[in-house]
Amino acid sequence: MRLPREIGPIHFVGIGGIGMSGIAEVLCNLGYTVQGSDASESANVNRLREKGIAISVGHKADNIAGADVLVVSTAIKRDNPELLAARAQRIPVVRRAEMLAELMRLKSCIAIAGTHGKTTTTSMVAALLDAGDVDPTVINGGIINAYGTNARLGAGDWMVVEADESDGTFLKLPADVAVVTNVDPEHLDHFKTFDAVQDAFRIFVENVPFYGFAVMCIDHPVVQALVGKIEDRRIITYGENPQADARLLDLKPSGAGSTFKVAFRDRKAGTAHEITDLMLPMPGPHNALNAVAAIAVAHELGLSDDTIRKALAAFGGVRRRFTKTGEWNGVTIIDDYGHHPVEIAAVLKAARQSTSAKVIAVVQPHRFTRLQSLFEEFCTCFNDADTVIVADVYPAGEAPIAGIDRDHFVLGLRAHGHREVIPLQDSASLAGVVAGVARSGDYVVCLGAGNITQWAYALPGELKALG
């Protein structure tokens, strides 16, 4: 039995969230009656309203009137008035991943998982399949620039989704193709131990049916170890590793992107094949690896080399993934979602490859618990930045932790050998600080998952206002 057409209205609590908004949009495009609520106005809320979805700002019991089902994310607390009202009225309550799983049952599905790179890789897979006239349905964790949204309903038989592992519910997703980009210690508030994180990714791959396949990056030692533990499933490995089934070769920086080729070796057939002259308009080895994952999926699904080559060269990127927000006196301002040490190091390496001048990092640490648990890693991931400007921790709903704050982080960076670390008093001070250190040719990279994105977009204008 599949999701019946007559069900509805479907009420989303926290509909403006990036994951929730994509599911709501696809359901609406399928013809279901969708409504919802969110704590505040946002671009996602406005976009969904334009599609005719009724959205209330603020959470109250009256909002769920007439709803047949309630969809909630893990961010919704158990004492949320809409959730309490639904349970009192015995209205079914489903988690976001469960509703996504229902949508996935309507198509053949590709699910992209990993601690980092999920959103970009999902977007790349979607772009390649689009170019191959597959016309996929897409539900992503970020705004795809080519679509202007994070979701679209396609007429084809395939669906491409970002599989969020943060609460373990990605194990509910019925994927025919699973991609694992990397596995690092993250979301330990849910998993408790890194061993539990690795077990979850192993189960994610083993859940793929016998007629499907997994694409896994063996450049990452934890993923390579997982490959060795998975039995009875077809796995295509990728990376620069000489043992990879899809091997990244001849990677070179080229302007604001990179060029490379991919060599395929089929273990069963004993054949080899190369896709040459590939160009990706995004900098950084990490993005080239994401592209190889997408290419491996597209190649396995039968897309031609020429289609892959053209689609990759035309890839428009994802919002908040090395996004240029403007310039000032020859200084380039970049906004990036990177908030984990591995992501930050990769983004700064990409920035270093993009300019021969200075790289200035502006970081807003995201969550006290993350800064605490990965403090050593945070103190050593800014090596490619000439200057680090440190803002206050963005709490994301967490209570402060004694000794885990901006000033402690600044001291940690200095103690680990960083030459220039500047504490930022507040966002209003940012333009003045940047103007004091940035010169023509420099890159200013704003990093974080909090409201620093607003600073990044405001910064070019604020710098110009200084004269």
UniProtKB/Swiss-Prot annotation:
Its main location: cytoplasm. One of its GO terms (cellular component) is cytoplasm. It catalyses: UDP-N-acetyl-alpha-D-muramate + L-alanine + ATP = UDP-N-acetyl-alpha-D-muramoyl-L-alanine + ADP + phosphate + H(+). It is an enzyme of class 6 (ligase). Its EC number is 6.3.2.8. InterPro entries: Mur-like_cat_sf (IPR036565), Mur_ligase_C (IPR004101), Mur_ligase_C_dom_sf (IPR036615), Mur_ligase_cen (IPR013221), Mur_ligase_N (IPR000713), MurCDEF_pg_biosynth (IPR050061), UDP-N-AcMur_Ala_ligase_MurC (IPR005758). Gene3D superfamilies: Mur ligase, C-terminal domain, Mur-like, catalytic domain, NAD(P)-binding Rossmann-like Domain. Keywords: ATP-binding, Cell cycle, Cell division, Cell shape, Cell wall biogenesis/degradation, Cytoplasm, Ligase, Nucleotide-binding, Peptidoglycan synthesis. The keyword Cell inner membrane does not apply. Transmembrane segments: none annotated. Pathway: Cell wall biogenesis; peptidoglycan biosynthesis. The keyword Acetylation does not apply. It comes from the Bacteria. Belongs to the MurCDEF family. NCBIfam families: murC (TIGR01082). Cell wall formation. HAMAP family: MurC. This is UDP-N-acetylmuramate--L-alanine ligase. It comes from Rhodopseudomonas palustris (strain BisB5). The lineage of its organism: Bacteria, Pseudomonadati, Pseudomonadota, Alphaproteobacteria, Hyphomicrobiales. The gene is murC.
